[in-house]
Amino acid sequence: MEKFKKVLLIDDDDIVNSINSVIIKHAKFADEVDTINNVPNALEFLNEAKSKGNSPDVIFLDLNMPGLDGWDFMDEYEKLEIKESSKVVMLTSSISSKDEERAASSNYITAFISKPLSPELLESIYESHLA
């Protein structure tokens, strides 16, 4: 599996972010892992990263978050200029077929994956969607 330079985790649950960060680092999936727990901060982070030329290679995005959710993030993400350089993987507990269909119809969502993240799932995501 190729190592990515930078991964961004967006999930309102800080414990989930911490666990996923450890899994990604342990699997040597990325050199750097940033975690953010809400959509406004994630969008601000991406704008700053873009201006510094340091956008994440992969964004793992939770769908169900209080306030602005994953779909709200995607609405704003589609307006950003980094969308061609970052791959979005929706990592969610949603079992809604409507969410899955909406993700499949998006030009910017690379994969719709059910939580929890594991080293094996990370490898599968890479092989199926990111390689």
Where do the model's predicted regions map?
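Alpha4 helix (beta4-alpha4-beta5 surface) of REC/receiver domains from two-component response regulators
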Residues: 72, 85, 95-111, 124
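Hydrophobic/aromatic residues positioned on beta-strands within the core alpha/beta folds
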Residues: 91-92
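Conserved acidic segment of CheY-like receiver
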Residues: 5-15, 20-24
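Active-site residues of response regulator receiver
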Residues: 62
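Receiver (REC) domain active-site loop signature in two-component systems and cognate sites
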Residues: 65
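Short amphipathic alpha-helix used as the core "switch/output" element in two-component signaling
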Residues: 71-82
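A Lys-centered signature of the CheY-like receiver
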Residues: 114-115
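Helix N-cap/capping motif at the beta->alpha junctions
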Residues: 35-44, 48, 70
